[in-house]
Amino acid sequence: YPQSINFIGNLKTHWSAHGCRFVHGFPPDSVLTYLFQLSDETKIQSLEQLSEKRCFIGHTHTLDIVSFGRQGLKSGKLKEGLNKLDSRRKYIISAGSVGQPRDGNNKAKYLIWDSTEDTVDVRFVAYDIAAVVEKMMAAGLPQKHAQRLW
């Protein structure tokens, strides 16, 4: 557990690869900012300033997608399954979460980005929440965090 905290504490605030940016909160490098807290104007400014065409974020525990192009800003929810991206638009994609669901569905949610096909495949997977809660409590983590997994 302390080794994990040290590892996480030494990570960079963002990472770029394959024409894509990865950041926990909001681009360019915030780990604390929530996507849903920001105005459309702020989202547009961020997308315009990004050198990458795709940006994956976390922090919200939701499957959100925001894109910007000639037709303006579009916002919505990613659905389970294959989602095709428009090569002419820039995107901020919230990748869901394993734990602490915000949508009433406590399955782990993750996605696979295919940079060649420019698709995002959203997947939901059941997992043993009770076992995870038990391990969290045994590790001395706060009970409120363990209970949020349900």
Model features per residue range: what roles?
Residues 1-56, 60-75:
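Conserved catalytic scaffold of divalent metal-dependent phosphoesterases
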Residues 70-150:
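Acidic, His/Gly-rich catalytic cores of divalent-metal-dependent hydrolytic chemistry
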